[in-house]
């Protein structure tokens, strides 16, 4: 998965495609995914247009991780992708809306410690139990809000360490939570049902 350079920005979709092609050609035997996350890169080109232009330029293009809350753009992109490209949804707090729009799956950071929350949400959606799916999506939103209160990246890493997967701290300039913050977070997550849907620690 490849994210666009965060300093120099392409002027148009064609420039983005050329940049991705230069990266993809370095590993032609591997599937190439472009990571579309405008909130971080400050670059927002239509993914459907990217797919059309990249289809003849990047032979190993497999899809795009779509991390953008614009469901209209997502539907357009799914239509452009057809069965040829994979477009996993990337905003955990809006998975239910994406499923209704046509998502077939997602790639999310909070899936690491809340796997059953999301598999249960997807299962509820697929059986038509929207009440349960909405409740689980609300839980996801509350969980993300709780983690974000002390800095999402650093707190996510600290939570993973508490669950037995030490991925190290966040690097500066990002902040890391104190042990007290992490203890308070775990209590908050338990109040949201973490013991039912969260990952199990050692």
Residue ranges and their predicted role:
Residues 24-30, 38-148:
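Catalytic alpha/beta core domains of metabolic enzymes, predominantly
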Residues 7-13, 38-44, 72, 174-176:
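Short, small-residue-enriched loops and turns at beta-alpha junctions
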Residues 11-19, 49:
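Alpha-helix N-cap and loop-to-helix initiation/capping positions
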Residues 6-7, 92:
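Active-site pre-Tyr helix/loop in NAD(P)-dependent dehydrogenases
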Residues 103, 110, 114-202:
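C-terminal alpha-helical cap/extension of soluble enzyme domains
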Residues 1-3:
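Short, small-residue-biased leader/transition segments that mark boundaries at the very start
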Residues 12-13, 79, 199:
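Short linear sequence elements within intrinsically disordered, low-complexity coil regions
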């Amino acid at each position: 998965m490849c994210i666009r350079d965060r300093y120099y920005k392409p002027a148009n979709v064609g420039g983005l495609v050329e940049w991705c092609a230069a990266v993809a050609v370095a590993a032609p035997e591997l599937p190439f995914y472009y990571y579309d996350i405008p909130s971080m890169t400050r670059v927002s080109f239509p993914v459907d247009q990217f797919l059309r232009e990249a289809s003849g330029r990047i032979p190993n293009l497999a899809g795009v991780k779509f991390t953008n809350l614009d469901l209209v753009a997502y539907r357009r992109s799914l239509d452009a992708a057809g069965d040829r490209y994979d477009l996993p949804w990337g905003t955990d707090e809006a998975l239910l809306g994406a499923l209704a729009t046509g998502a077939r799956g997602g790639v999310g950071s909070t899936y690491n410690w809340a796997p059953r929350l999301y598999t249960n949400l997807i299962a509820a959606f697929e059986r038509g139990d929207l009440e349960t799916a909405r409740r689980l999506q609300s839980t996801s939103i509350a969980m993300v809000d709780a983690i974000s209160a002390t800095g999402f990246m650093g707190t996510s890493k600290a939570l993973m360490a508490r669950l037995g997967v030490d991925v190290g701290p966040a690097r500066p300039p990002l902040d890391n939570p104190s042990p007290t913050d992490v203890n308070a977070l775990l209590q908050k997550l338990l109040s949201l049902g973490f013991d039912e849907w969260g990952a199990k620690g050692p």
